[in-house]
Swiss-Prot record:
Keywords recorded for this protein, A-Z: Calcium, Hydrolase, Lipid degradation, Lipid metabolism, Metal-binding, Repeat
Residues annotated as the enzyme's active site: 331, 333, 338, 659, 661, 666
Native source species: Cynara cardunculus (Cardoon)
EC number of the protein: 3.1.4.4
SUPFAM superfamilies associated with the record: C2 domain (Calcium/lipid-binding domain, CaLB) (SSF49562), Phospholipase D/nuclease (SSF56024)
SMART domains reported in the protein's UniProt record: C2, PLDc
Domain notes per entry: C2 domain is a calcium-binding fold, and the binding promotes the protein association with membranes. A lower affinity toward calcium can be anticipated for PLD alpha due to the absence of two potential calcium ligands.
PLD phosphodiesterase domain residues: 326-364, 654-681
This protein's name: Phospholipase D alpha 1
GO MF annotations, alphabetized: calcium ion binding; phospholipase D activity
Length: 808
């Protein structure tokens, strides 16, 4: 049966199986289980029956496990499923769970074509065995399905029409009104970074300074400071700009937190416990997160610092639990404090929260100039970060690895949602309860309420999203019914919040003109990859974001409208670029790009167009090249002869590491958080993540382009990356804009990769160094198999030994 595109939303209810065996005799499953139990020695177990929902081989839903009903399991569970898949069947698989996996009981097939008219289908479907024959008992499963094509969504391709837009549906946290948002590019913005960007109402964009604001927020706290991080390093100062010093600004972060705790402020920290940081690996661990060092620093102090492993929820098998606890991380990066009111003069306090991609650790402090060598005797002398070359050190000199990132501050009712997220996590994994009893602060702490008036032109509507499950958050509902009401996804005895992926999907589907993405990773939708040299079913990077992007572009091409997606990623994932894990991720990235370009090329050909596909989807990376200055820091040692480190030092160049996790849609809506565009971050049951989605209701792209703070922030980012502003950048959906950006990035790549350059690179935005054929194939650029100063293939290489779950 031919496959058809299901692009929209599936509503599915799985009711029950009528009978799994005939009469009272043993079924095939019973014999299988007896054999397994005897072989592995787990003893006789209780049948735990569950059902899965697949679009062909892509898992899109899973029920809870039903115990002690081996004959007639009844789930009565409903699912809200976003889909962007080509499929001929929706497959319902019935399984019995066991300690090392699951035993197949049978499959039922629902032809997709029966759903395309949008009518509700309620039926019993015959269950087939492994050989596609009816089961001996003639078992059937009762399901109800209804498909809503994406074009039936009232928000499809319409942007945010009014300030009454209610936010992303089916989520744990509702959208909050009357908020304030501050957006940060990099950890710091120096005074001489002043792009003149016009906003609505005759105003101009003003940058904010992330680590200065976090320093002020921590310093001002009187009652609580709550921090979560992938890494928190005590030995860093937050204030480093000699032109913007603050009283007490030279204090290190660890000492600042100790000082606040000594003042009576409740300081509680959840830092990811890198389980590789044991002696066999060295104390820093494979990830060098300083987790043990941070814990030891706060031992026997009033700071409550908990090393927090990524524990599995209780629903997985032994094998699944092992994967979660050893492969995945806590990746949320938040700070929550009580803070004075904006104009002071009151004993009242409010909640203020920070959410984004920047950990409070070494290697993160940087500015829009992203120096390689010039700050090695100042801001980066004691914070030299270069993990891409073995043995790199300040003694051996630059280039350091510059760090580009994005963060946000939220105020108003949304800040309380970030606080609640911390409380949920602490109550699950924080040990003894040291959380401040907020009821005791009723007279001091202003409850969740708007911080702007309804007619304030600068107000924001903001919604909090997460990737997290019941293994990391306390108080998730126990039943699928309650989980569904709370906007959560129920799995195999696991309750999951997967709303970050939902937020991206909804924003892409709403988009009208353009999308701008910066992300540390870009891979996924593996169900749509070419399968000529891999088994795509084993990859499991099933999140929809890349496919949603390409389908949006395809739809616009079909309608004769222009739509452009700009994506900025790092040259390679941080680490030694020749290593197997880095090469594997680059391979997944190439396959993702190729899948998207194939979609675009097919759509162009169907319309008889011979356009360059890079006019619709274009990938960039960031890099810098710095001429030697007199009086520059001189290293006392030299890198290894003929090493990539030495070549990069001699050529005065290196990538700027893109660690951002951000998407801007039509200059009216922005997502900022900790989540990468990969399966680890978007799954919900892998890495824990947090993000916020926000817009200004008085600055929407309705009749005229949006010219609020989201627009100003994008323009400031482009000024940072390109070193200039151009009138065409005001309208990224126009061909003039994408051609200008591509032309400048191509030129900067040529300068970056050239043998000699005796001046600073004029801009940081570089073409991602791959070619795109008119057939959509991703190829090497002529003479550019490897990244400069490395022997690492740009197109990557599939790994024969690393499991995909680790690198996707």
């Amino acid at each position: 049966m031919s496959k058809v595109l299901l692009h929209g939303t599936l509503h599915v209810t799985v009711y029950e199986v009528d009978k799994l065996r005939e009469g009272g005799g043993p079924n095939v499953f019973g014999k299988l289980m007896a054999n397994i139990q005897e072989t592995v020695g787990f003893g006789e177990g209780t049948p735990k029956i569950y059902a899965t929902i697949d679009l062909e081989k892509s898992r899109v839903g899973r029920t809870r496990m039903i115990e002690n009903e081996p004959q007639n399991p009844r789930w009565y569970e409903s699912f809200h499923i976003y889909c962007a898949h080509h499929a001929s069947n929706i497959i319902f698989t019935v399984k019995d769970d066991n300690p090392i996996g699951a035993t197949l009981l049978g499959r039922a097939y629902m032809p997709v074509r029966e759903l395309l008219d949008g009518d509700e289908v309620d039926k019993w479907i015959e269950i087939m065995d492994e050989d596609n024959n009816p089961t001996p008992a003639g078992s059937k499963i009762h399901v109800k399905l209804q498909y809503f094509d994406v074009t039936q969504d009232r928000n499809w391709d319409r942007g945010i029409k009014t300030g009454k837009y209610p936010g992303v549906p089916y989520t744990f946290f509702a959208q909050r009104q009357g908020c304030r948002v501050s957006l940060y590019q990099d950890a710091h913005v120096p005074d001489n970074f002043i792009p003149k960007i016009s906003l609505a109402g005759g105003k101009y964009y003003e940058p904010h300074r992330c680590w200065e604001d976090i320093f002020d927020a921590i310093s001002d706290a009187k009652h609580f400071i709550y921090i979560t991080g992938w890494s928190v390093y005590t030995q860093i100062p937050l204030i480093r700009d000699p032109n913007r010093q603050k009283p007490g600004g030279d204090v290190l972060l660890g000492q600042l937190l100790k000082k606040k705790a000594d003042e009576g402020v409740r300081v509680a920290m959840l830092v990811w416990d890198d389980r590789t940081s044991v002696n066999v690996f060295k104390e820093d661990g494979l990830m060098a997160t300083h987790d043990e060092e941070t814990e030891n620093f706060f031992k026997d102090t009033d700071v409550h610092c908990i090393l927090c492993p990524r524990d599995p929820d209780d629903g997985g098998s032994i094998i699944q639990d092992l994967k979660v606890s050893t492969m995945f991380t806590h990746h949320q990066k938040i700070v929550v404090v009580d803070h004075e009111l904006p104009r002071g003069g009151s004993q009242k306090r409010r909640v203020m929260s920070f959410v984004g991609g920047i950990d409070l650790c070494d290697g993160r402090y940087d500015s829009a100039f992203h120096p390689l060598f010039s700050t090695l005797d100042s801001a980066h002398h004691d914070d030299f970060h270069q993990p891409n070359y073995a043995g790199a050190s300040i003694a051996k000199g630059g280039p350091r690895e510059p760090w580009h990132d994005i963060h946000s501050r939220v105020e108003g009712p949304i800040a309380w949602d970030v606080l609640f997220n911390f409380e949920q996590r602490w109550r699950k994994q924080g040990g003894k309860n040291v959380l401040v009893d907020l009821k005791q602060l009723d007279d001091i702490l202003i409850p969740p309420s708007p911080v702007t008036f309804p007619n304030d032109q600068e107000t924001w509507n903001v919604q909090l999203f997460r990737s997290i499950d019941g293994g990391a958050a306390f108080g998730f509902p126990d039943t699928p019914e309650e989980a569904s009401k709370s906007g959560l996804v129920s799995g195999k005895d696991n309750i999951i919040d997967r709303s970050i992926q939902d937020a991206y999907i909804n924003a892409i589907r709403r988009a009208k003109h353009f999308i701008y993405i910066e992300n540390q990773y870009f891979l996924g939708s593996s169900f749509a990859w070419k399968s000529d040299d891999i088994d795509v079913d084993e990859v499991g990077a099933l999140h929809l974001i890349p496919k949603e992007l390409s389908l949006k572009i395809v739809t616009k091409i079909q309608e004769g409208e222009k739509f452009i997606v700009y994506i900025v990623v790092p040259m390679w994932p941080e680490g030694i670029p020749e290593n197997g894990s880095v090469q594997a991720i680059l391979d997944w990235q190439r396959r993702t790009m190729e899948m998207m370009y194939k979609d675009i090329v097919d759509a162009l050909q169907d319309k008889g167009l011979d356009d360059d596909p890079r006019e619709y989807l274009t990938f960039f990376c960031l890099g810098n090249r710095e001429a030697k200055k007199s009086g520059e820091y001189e290293p006392t040692e030299a890198p290894e002869p003929d090493s990539g480190y030495l070549h990069a030092q001699e050529n005065r160049r290196f990538m700027i590491y893109v660690h951002s996790k951000m998407m801007i849609v039509d200059d009216e809506y922005i997502i900022v958080g900790s989540a990468n565009i990969n399966q680890r971050s978007m799954d919900g049951a892998r890495d824990s993540e947090i993000a916020m989605g926000a817009y200004q209701p008085y600055h929407l792209a309705t009749q005229t382009p949006a010219r609020g703070h989201v627009h100003g922030f994008r323009m400031a980012l482009w000024y940072e990356h390109l070193g200039m502003l151009d009138d065409s950048f005001e309208r990224p959906e126009n061909k003039d804009c994408v051609n200008k950006a591509n032309e400048m990035a191509d030129k900067c790549w040529d300068l970056y990769a050239s043998e000699d350059l005796d001046r600073d690179l004029p801009g940081h935005l570089l073409r991602y160094p791959v070619g795109v054929t008119r057939k959509g194939d991703i190829t090497e650029l002529p003479g550019t198999e490897c990244f400069p100063d490395t022997s690492a293939r740009i197109l990557g290489a599939k790994s024969d030994y690393l499991p995909p779950i680790l690198t996707t």
